[in-house]
From Swiss-Prot:
Protein known as: Phosphoribosylformylglycinamidine synthase subunit PurL
CDD domains xrefs: PurL_repeat1 (cd02203), PurL_repeat2 (cd02204)
Ligand binding (substrate): 95-98, 117, 241, 313-315, 535
Taxonomy of the source species: Bacteria, Pseudomonadati, Pseudomonadota, Alphaproteobacteria, Hyphomicrobiales
Bilayer-spanning residue ranges: none
UniProt source species: Brucella abortus (strain 2308)
Length: 740
């Protein structure tokens, strides 16, 4: 039977495809006629925010993307960074926000699958994963269901595929009630001479479809991810893809085997907008046309239209340009792994994107205008307002600082994430040196005696809401600081920019200023952005999420035997604060969680100080002077030393200095670390800090089973541990909500 590929193009249909009237007018001018239904779908997919970055491209160009170790920056499936000895690390972070809210298990699972494919498409074997998750307030009726589904989906896919989850974040805020965020990160290892790109080369070469069969799942997924949610959200469930990690594992092995055979000219995974996006990107990058014959596409559903095949986001699929003489060898490899292998088209020299179905041409479009030359907007934006200064003396103190510390360390945002990461395989592959729960995840580099990689993912959305510029700087600085706190040298980063509707000038202003802050920090800290993703329209019924520009980074440890952890304190050690005393309580968790206030400015990030203090800490760790190290962030000094006490199972008696106790204990000033060292080493560190111009304070001594800070805090490590470990399992068991 003949499948109908025609449909009348009406204003309603155009609007349903997310195309504005001026964009449709541009299509008419480009092709000189009315588009076919399939062509309308192709334009819709390629010109939406998810694929084209049309609202953010202008600003993304301002980010620093090069450096002495950068082999491949943005524009490919993932970034590539040199780690010496002919090895490189390949990594990226990407969002799967909209699908995960609609169908949490599959949305999160396919988010993990998609980011792993981005990495192994480049020729790298995945070695580490992270995920940064944001959920609504704990007592919202959907939150527990969403947490459970997302965590199960992340674990279900990553564990079965066989990649360790080494880190991540989980936050709760009412601004995510209607739009959760699932940002997935993956990193892989490859050789310099084994990197594969998506740029097609050569005319008349076979275009090959690899992997799983195509079905209707995920049709329109990229378009859905470029729109706000409203009351019709349940109708969007069919646009969520379904993943199979075992097929993906076979695809990984088949691709790496094929790459080693020398058969691959270009390769691209099928992610957002599926066959459309992968074919267009390969052709447009290589200044070639592509002709596809859809009758050759392996399908698992009957009577699929050209539109459905072109826009399906079925998982575990790749598109490749192949050396013709290697066809039989390539096919044998994929058959061995039980995967589909089909020649579905060829490269051409006419820069046209042609799609044939049932002998009929259903699309014939200029390939460059779909890809590189998609519309780009300079959207109007508004400078974000500033919060009035908030001196610590104007912030109320609490009567009982021990109770305040217990409440904060047992709160939704600061409590242990053990419930989450124990559902992930953190040790598979056997190279994990630091698992989640510290400052950064660390894995050994396979085949190298001493080399290791450190990974962290960070952002403080409430800072970004108060001041997108400082918040953007702080996200980069904290990621850099977390990597540094292990002793690793931060090499490069990837950004995942999650914002509301860019058509609103105040939201666009958040995006512009956050990118500006990120760029300034990356330049100052030599931490270039080598890959990334933008997720806009994270709004429901007009309510936007907190601006959340997540930064994930990778660092290099030349010798993992000289590495710091947060739980290494020994009895008799001296604790030293490197960096200034706490003074800043604006936008702090102290203010938010104890007084339900969100006023004051975000903390200022002095990037020169960040660099100086961080480099000093790193050299102390690498010189073997440090037994434990932890950076200071949410909750300031008191939370940092409490976490070190919990992880070490040891108490400490400390003096935080003279001043306002709430600021000294809970101030969130930046560029600070706490280290522990033997008394002799602590003296040497203090002497060196003085010489290097790094502010420091000798805090006190490790020992006993209580944490005592000045005359304000006196609490047992057992009580701290109970509060810290208790909130998440109690919440998921339905025993509490909110900040109880």
């Amino acid at each position: 039977m003949t499948i109908s590929n025609t449909r009348d193009i009406t204003p309603e249909l155009i609007e349903a495809h997310g195309l504005k009237p001026d964009e449709y007018q541009r299509i008419l001018e480009l092709i000189g006629r009315e588009p076919t239904f399939t062509e309308l779908g192709i334009f819709s997919a390629m010109w939406n925010e998810h694929c084209s970055y049309k609202s953010s491209k202008k600003w993304l160009r301002t980010l620093p993307t090069s450096g002495p170790r950068v082999i491949q920056g943005p524009g490919e499936n993932a970034g590539v960074v040199d780690i010496g000895d002919g090895d490189c690390v390949v990594f990226k972070m990407e969002s799967h926000n909209h699908p995960s809210y609609i169908e949490p298990y599959q949305g999160a699972a396919t988010g993990v699958g998609g980011i792993l494919r981005d990495v192994f498409t480049m020729g790298a074997r995945p070695v580490a994963a992270m995920n940064a998750l944001r959920f609504g307030e704990p007592d919202h009726p959907k939150t527990r269901h969403l947490v459970s589904g997302v965590v199960s989906g992340v674990g279900g896919y990553g564990n079965a595929f066989g990649v360790p989850t080494v880190g991540g974040e989980v936050n709760f805020d009412k601004r995510y009630n209607g739009n959760i965020l699932v940002n997935a990160f993956a990193a892989g290892l490859a050789r310099h001479d084994g990197i594969f790109l998506s740029e097609a080369e050569g005319v008349g070469l076979p275009v090959v479809y690899l992997g799983a069969k195509t079905s209707r799942d995920g049709v329109g997924g990229a378009t859905m991810a470029s729109a706000e949610f409203d009351e019709s959200i349940e109708e969007k469930r069919p646009t969520v893809q379904v993943g199979d990690p075992f097929t993906e594992k076979c695809l990984l092995e088949a691709c790496l085997e094929l790459m080693a055979s020398g058969a691959v000219i270009a390769i691209q995974d099928m992610g957002a907008a599926g066959l459309t996006c992968s074919a267009v990107e390969m052709g447009a990058k290589g200044d070639l046309g592509i002709e596809l014959i859809l009758d050759h596409v392996p399908v698992r559903e009957e009577n699929m239209t050209a539109y459905e095949m072109m826009l399906s986001e079925s998982q575990e699929r790749m598109l490749m340009v192949l050396k013709p003489e290697k066809e039989a060898e390539a096919q044998a490899i994929f058959r061995k792994w039980g995967l589909d292998f089909a020649i579905v088209g060829k490269t051409t020299d006419d820069l046209r994107f042609r799609v044939i179905h049932q002998g009929e041409e259903v699309a014939n479009l200029p390939i460059k205008d779909l890809g590189d030359e998609a519309p780009e907007y300079d959207r109007p934006w508004m400078e974000p307002g500033k919060h009035a200064p908030l001196p610590a003396s104007n912030v109320p103190q609490v009567e009982d600082y021990s109770a305040a510390l217990l409440k904060l360390i047992g709160s939704p945002d600061l409590s242990s994430r053990r419930w989450v990461y124990e559902q992930y395989d953190t040790l598979i592959q056997g190279n994990s040196l630091q698992v989640p729960g510290g400052d950064a995840g660390v894995i050994r580099v396979e085949g190298h005696e001493t080399k290791a990689l450190a990974f962290s993912s960070d952002v403080t959305p409430r800072y970004c809401e108060a001041d997108p510029f400082e918040g953007g700087k702080q996200a980069v600085a904290e990621c850099w600081r977390n990597i540094t706190a292990t002793g690793a040298e931060p090499l490069a980063s990837t950004d995942n920019l999650n914002f509301g509707n860019p058509e609103k000038p105040e939201i666009m202003g958040q995006l512009v200023k956050a990118i500006e802050g990120i760029g300034e920090a990356c330049r100052a800290l030599d931490f270039p952005i080598v890959s990334g993703n933008v997720s806009l329209y994270n709004e429901t019924n007009g309510q936007a999420i907190l601006p959340t520009p997540t930064i994930a980074g990778v660092g290099l440890l030349p010798d993992w035997s000289q590495m710091a952890k947060i739980g290494g304190m020994q009895d008799g050690d001296t604790l030293v604060l490197l960096g200034g005393d706490g003074t800043h309580l604006g936008q702090s968790v102290y203010l938010r969680d104890l007084f339900d206030r969100a006023d004051g400015p975000a903390p200022f990030v002095d990037l020169a100080l960040e660099k100086r203090n961080g480099e000093f800490v790193r050299s102390a760790i690498r010189n073997g002077q440090v037994t434990a190290c932890h950076d200071l962030s949410d909750g300031g000094l008191a939370i940092a030393v409490a976490e070190m006490a919990i992880k070490s199972g040891k108490g400490a008696t400390l003096d935080a200095g003279d001043g306002l106790p709430h600021a000294l204990l809970f101030g969130e000033d930046q560029a600070r670390y706490v280290i522990s060292a033997t008394p002799e080493m602590a003296k040497l560190i203090a002497l060196n800090a003085e010489g290097a111009g790094v502010p420091f304070r000798i805090l006190g001594t490790v020992g006993g089973d209580r944490l005592k800070i000045s005359k304000n805090v006196d609490v047992s490590v057992a009580d701290l541990t109970q509060a810290y470990e208790g909130w998440f399992p109690n919440f998921m068991n339905g025993e509490l909500t909110g900040n109880n």
